[in-house]
Design a protein with these regions (language model features):
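Hydrophobic/aromatic-rich transmembrane helices and adjacent perimembrane loops
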Residues: 238-241, 328, 406-412, 539-574
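Hydrophobic, aromatic-rich transmembrane alpha-helices
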Residues: 337-348, 407-417, 490-517, 564
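Membrane-embedded, hydrophobic transmembrane alpha-helices
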Residues: 1-137
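Extracytoplasmic
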Residues: 570-762
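Hydrophobic alpha-helical membrane-interfacial segments at the cytosolic entry of transmembrane helices
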Residues: 143-152, 264-268, 420-443, 607-612
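Active-site lumenal/periplasmic loops and adjacent helix-entry segments of GT-C-fold
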Residues: 141-142, 152-334, 354, 630-634, ...
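Membrane-interface alpha helices of multi-pass inner-membrane proteins
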Residues: 319-324, 370, 375-378, 386-401, ...
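Membrane-interface helix-loop-helix junctions at transmembrane boundaries of multi-pass membrane enzymes
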Residues: 127-131, 135-138, 348-385, 417-427, ...
Length: 762
């Protein structure tokens, strides 16, 4: 029997139907709250000529997908929380709430569609077709976007499916992800097969949950609705990553005016920039008798992360991080949507300041004008609708990805400084903080259990270790050390935005253009700065997500820069003169003899920069491929495990087990929780593993041989079963404490298996 698939044949399509309904609802909600996406594009784009290059669907579909999955999952969870005590034992726990949720969101989606249809019909009848430039559906443009989506989708599918896949009845998890993936599998099965309400951390039962688990409720729900565990995890991951990369590329096109940026932005996202491969190549070439062929072969065949900066050997900056942390892509996508929604207000401030003469009038406009704080009257952008959508996103976001929510607030704070409609930003911040506090209290017992903001300088830079509480004056003295670290770790992703900031700022000032693009780089850097000055969780290394968010946002500008280098926005003098057209301010024209070599030289520079930006990423894809080879680079979970099968059939969905300190084990496919699993996961999530380990070791002794005390404590913690396994003898934390004779003599044996595992009932 395959665990959790007892009713697959009857309801596997329910999972697909749920996703379709979620996406349908999300797209209709976005359409309803943002009535004119072309107008939103106008508020974001560098110029009007960019609009025909960008289809409306490139925002509507990915934003609708992410918003739909976010909100339907959020509502389904709380429906399940309320309903689960009343669900009959022979009915899957999530099925009733899923049916109710699908009915609700189908109705809401249809209602919103009908409202949008009537509104658009009346608008066209009263005002005629929109005067904004529609998408120009020429063959080359359509082919470009379709090809780009296919290429990006192929890359995304490879990243996710290469390290999480099925072979027969076995789930295979690649070597580079299986450890961190262990709690994700356990949480997914906890909802898909078990009943994890009130929700607790599966490797640390009895202490609420402090981990942002909501994405894995979605994957668990997919398993509950019939998808095999692998596809329950992979399918939502693919949808979220594809949507995020689509939004990233779309924003790059709008800000650069170059269509090629749509593909370049995802490429930069997937293949990171760093010094690693260049440093490694120089080391290899310096070896006696080394050749470039040897260097190339060594780099492409290696199966270990190259450790140039601290924790590079864990692959935390590599493509592996997205395979490991499946919820990260969703969080990044939501950050991008929030930027889209507020960027028009940011752009408007600079647009109107450029039309005002005199410092006094500019200061008045910037600080105390009505538009600086309140929405404009009869604004075609419909800012209230955008504000409602942003509020709904941050309301649901805290336990989907807390770090991305903090990153979003940091970016929005930076944008608000230079923006109109600042009270809108404030409203979003208030909703996010209130929602975070309430959810933290509900899930974790208090906000301090989830995040505690304190000053901590230097991230994980070894040279600053031990001096992380140094004052601001001392911290400034380490500026060179921080810059050196960023240069090694980010290379051109750090250098190019700095050059672009000053270069683009000078260009916009010289030609009297809107300054919003170079200034936007400032709020984009706020998560990066935050990562070096603040500690949010017990593990400072977790701040790497803030740095990655900033780097991803920088990629938007870098992609636009490369796209402009690839095809310079310059005209041919003879052609312009022959047409009789006037050149726009800031436009450059060259004689044909100069145009061709200039264009060729620019394209060559672009290709060299692209190589420098992606070389380390390409080498890390090679490592990812070699480390997780399908011949031997995996850990297997057996869906036909007799132990897990017995547990599913003979225990309650919310029963807790005393087990070895398991990390990745077949047992977790049963959806049951353990008292104390591998402690790193729980520790990094903020749980008190030190006290729990003392109590755990005491339990392994049989409460020092006191059966009454043992039963009392087990009853207090909800422990119903004890599993005997030789795995107790594999770690120093358990081998000297485990007393198998106590359990055999005092507890009732309920199951014994050929692999030596025995299950006792407390």
């Amino acid at each position: 029997m395959i665990i959790g698939y007892t009713y697959v044949e009857e309801c596997i399509m329910l999972a697909i139907l749920y996703l379709i309904i979620a996406i349908f609802f999300g797209t209709q909600l976005v359409r309803f709250l943002i009535p004119d996406i072309r107008r939103l594009y106008v508020g974001v784009a560098v110029d009007q000529q960019t609009l025909p290059k960008v289809p409306t669907a490139l925002f509507l579909l990915p934003a609708g997908t992410l918003v739909g999955l976010l909100l339907t999952t959020f509502v389904t969870y709380f429906l399940s929380y309320v309903i689960h005590p009343f669900v009959p034992a022979d009915t899957p726990t999530l099925l009733p709430s899923d049916i109710i949720a699908m009915c609700i969101f189908t109705y809401l989606g249809c209602l919103l569609w009908q409202r949008c249809f009537v509104r658009d019909y009346r608008k066209v009848k009263a005002q005629g077709p929109s005067k904004l430039g529609p998408f120009k559906k020429d063959v080359n443009t359509v082919i470009f976007y379709v090809t780009s989506v296919i290429l990006v989708l192929s890359a995304v599918c490879f990243v996710y499916c290469y390290t999480c896949y099925m072979r027969g009845n076995n789930i295979r998890l690649g070597f580079s992800i299986f450890s961190d993936f262990a709690p994700h599998v356990a949480i997914t099965s906890g909802f898909g097969v078990g009943s994890n309400f009130p929700t607790q951390y599966p490797h640390f039962s009895g202490d609420n949950i402090q981990y942002h688990f909501m994405f894995y409720f979605l994957t668990g729900n997919m398993e509950a609705l019939g998808l095999p565990l692998v596809w329950a995890i992979n399918l939502p991951s693919i949808l979220c990553m594809l949507s995020t990369l689509t939004l990233l590329g779309t924003l790059a096109v709008l800000l650069s005016g170059r269509r090629a940026a749509y593909l370049l932005a995802p490429v930069l996202f997937l293949f990171r920039s760093a010094w690693n491969v260049f440093h490694q190549a120089s080391e290899l070439k310096a070896l006696p008798g080394s050749t470039w062929s040897y260097v190339f072969k060594t780099i492409t065949k290696q199966a270990v992360w190259y450790g140039y900066t601290i924790r590079d050997e864990w692959g935390i900056w590599a493509i592996n991080v997205y395979a490991n942390q499946r919820h990260f892509a969703l969080g990044i996508g939501l950050v991008l949507i929030l930027i889209f929604l507020f960027l028009p207000h940011f752009r408007r401030m600079f647009l109107h300041l450029s039309r005002i003469d005199g410092f006094k009038d500019c200061a008045k406009r910037f600080f105390i004008s009505k538009e600086a704080w309140l929405p404009r009257e009869n604004d075609p952008l419909h800012p209230i609708g955008s504000l409602i959508l942003a509020g709904m996103i941050v309301l649901a976001m805290p336990f989907f990805h807390g770090s991305c929510l903090i990153s979003a607030l940091l970016v929005l704070f930076g944008m608000a400084i230079f923006s109109e409609f600042r009270l809108g930003y404030l409203g979003v911040a208030i909703v996010s903080v209130l929602s975070s506090v309430l959810q933290a209290r509900f899930f974790a017992g208090g906000a301090s259990n989830v995040a505690s903001f304190k000053y901590y300088f230097g991230f994980v830079i070894p040279e600053i270790e031990g001096k992380n509480t140094a004052g601001l004056g001392s911290a400034i003295g380490y500026t060179g050390t921080v810059i050196s670290y960023l240069n090694k770790m980010g290379f051109l992703t750090v250098i190019i935005p700095c050059v672009l900031f000053f270069g683009l700022l000078a260009y916009e000032i010289w030609f009297k253009k809107n300054l919003y693009r170079p200034i936007l780089l400032i709020p984009f850097s706020f998560p990066l700065i935050f990562a070096f000055y603040c500690q949010v969780s017990l593990e400072v290394l977790a701040n790497h997500k803030f740095i990655q968010v900033s780097f991803i946002l920088f990629d938007i500008f870098i992609a636009g820069f490369l796209a402009n280098l690839l095809a310079l926005p310059i005209g041919i003098k003879e052609r312009v003169e022959a047409s009789g057209e006037k050149t726009q301010s800031g436009s450059i024209v060259l004689p044909k003899k100069a145009f061709i070599p200039t264009q060729i030289g620019s394209a060559i520079v672009c290709l060299f920069l692209l190589f420098g930006l992606t070389a380390t990423g390409i080498s890390e894809w090679c490592i990812y491929y070699n480390l997780n080879t399908h011949k031997s680079g995996y850990v297997e979970l057996h869906t036909d495990s007799l132990v897990a099968d017995w547990v599913v059939k003979n225990t309650n969905e919310d029963d807790i087990f005393l087990t070895p300190m398991w990390s990745t084990d077949d047992f977790f496919l049963s959806g049951r929780r353990v008292y104390y699993g591998w402690p790193y996961f729980a520790w990094s999530a903020g749980h008190d593993t030190e006290t729990r380990q003392i109590n755990y070791q005491w339990l392994l002794t049989g409460a020092n041989g006191n059966v009454d005390e043992f039963r009392r404590y087990c009853n207090e913690m909800g422990i119903k079963y004890v599993i005997h396994s030789s795995d107790y003898y594999g770690t120093g934390e358990t081998k000297d404490f485990y007393n198998p004779e106590f359990f055999a003599a005092n507890l009732t044996e309920v199951a014994r298996f050929d692999n030596g595992i025995v299950i006792y009932k407390v």
